[in-house]
Every structure is written in C-alpha cells, then in structure tokens.
C-alpha cells in the first residue's frame, strides 16, 4: 500500500550518495494507483524524482525497462516498492568493486556493464503476511527462475559451474514434485509407499 511505497521512496531520498541521484518511480499500471498519489505529492518538487505512470498493467519487468531506458548514470539500482534501504547503500554500491556475483551479474558484465558487490550494503524487505501472498510470491519467483533456466544457453559460454547451478536450482524442485507424484501413484495402485 501507500505506506510501503512511501517508506521505500523515503529510504531512497535519504541516501548519502555524493553523486547525482535520479530516481524513477514507476507505477506499472497496478490496480492500486492510489498508493503512489501521496508519494508523488510529497516528492513532485524534488528534482531528483520523476514519476512514470504506465497506462496499463505491464508488469515489473517492462516497468523496469522503462526506467532503465530513461537512466543515464553509471549505477542503476532497481528496487521493489516493498524494499527500504539503509542510508549508505548507494554510496557503498558505487564504491570500488570487491567481488563478482552470480549469473545475472556475469551476463551484465558480458554485455559491457560494470557491476559491484558490497557485503555491507543491506536492504530490508517486507515478507508476505499471509499464505496466499506467500504462494503468489513463490509462484512469481518460480516463473522468474524458470525463465532464467531457459536462458541457460547464454550461460554455457560463460561459466560451467554457474550453468550447472542454474539448472540444478530448477531441476531439484521438479524432481521433488515427480517423486511425490510417483509415491502417490504407487500408494493409489498398490496400497504401499516407496518411503516406508
């Protein structure tokens, strides 16, 4: 709701980043557009903030693409509306590189972008507070993870361990589901269970 969006944007506004900060707040055409109105009213005169209202629901990915298309900085940080950041996150992310991250980071580097990992940069997020919200989140994440697996051909030329990690991360749950279905089928057909 509005309180989450306000907390997120306020945490970005308070960043101690010394460089030029541009913030694109994108409403992806959600059904709850009223949540962004108080945030817009509060930051409309702040030159660091731009508000983009998508005419129809396009989803997070396309909303992110719109914001990234408007960006011209060296550092692009994508934040969900339910995330709040500590004051030094942007400055720590903009500091000297210390370590390489995982597959999406390698793909970005391969495309010519510079990426940074700073272990001291901590963000907090709101966790689902109901089983339905949790299941929706997990379904969303599973779709995203499966889409990453479909991009495995992009990983093949980069790092075999990352490729195996990506495949294994999606193969495990599929094998678990197959195991449960097989067990239930055995129970239904033979009145025995394979794990006794």
From Swiss-Prot:
Keyword Cell membrane: yes
Alphabetized InterPro entries for the sequence: Glyco_trans_2-like (IPR001173), Nucleotide-diphossugar_trans (IPR029044)
A GO molecular function held by the record: hyaluronan synthase activity
Location of this chain's protein in the cell: Cell membrane
Membrane topology: Peripheral membrane protein
Family to which this protein belongs: Belongs to the NodC/HAS family.
Job of this protein: Involved in the synthesis of Nod factor, a sulfated N-acyl-beta-1,4-tetrasaccharide of N-acetylglucosamine which initiates a series of events in the host plant species leading eventually to nodulation.
The protein, known as: N-acetylglucosaminyltransferase
